[in-house]
Amino acid sequence: DSPKVVKFVFSDHHDAYVLERADKLGVANASLELKEFTSKVDYEKALVEILEAQEIDLILLAGYMKIIGSTMLARYKGKIINVHPSFLPDFAGSPHAIEESHEAKYGLGITIHYVDEGVDTGEIIAQIPVAYHESLEVYEERVHEAEHELYPKVVRQIILHQQ
């Protein structure tokens, strides 16, 4: 039993399936696209306003492929968590970490970490290895299974520790 629930979903793509899923579950949601703003700072200011209006105190990233800027970090430092599909520091910052770790046959695993000013350089919270498979599709499936197993456990521990 989790002491908190997902109360808000945000996407940086208006057509993201997660927004449809949130609607079906009755979870408040919104989307903004960077191209709608004159600068990343303006984009992040608008996002912070939305998050503050929803009283969000912990941000969980999944598939958010933008670098979190100083506007977000100033407001939510130590409150943004990311899941990365490699055993960091291997393939930090790579948008193709699954493919690259599979091809290299190292860095095989996932990492849950706090977001800081760098790219995939924040404090590591948890890591688990993922067994190599010669098929990229099978390996990718294993990575996603590991993410779905570890991420909720880590978040639950963080929430319980904050209370």
Predicted regions and their residues:
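N-terminal Rossmann-like dinucleotide-binding module
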Residues: D1-Y17, R21
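Donor/substrate-binding cores of folate-linked one-carbon enzymes
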Residues: D12, L58, A62-Q162
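Structural motif corresponding to alpha-helix initiation and N-cap regions
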Residues: A16, K40-K45, S70, S94-P95
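A short acidic, often aromatic-flanked loop/helix-cap motif at beta-alpha or helix-coil junctions
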Residues: A16-Y17, K35-K40, G118
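Short, conserved SAM-binding/catalytic segment
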Residues: D23-S31
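Short beta->alpha connector loops at strand-helix junctions that form conserved
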Residues: A30-K35, V83
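Short phosphate-binding loop-to-helix
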Residues: K35-K66
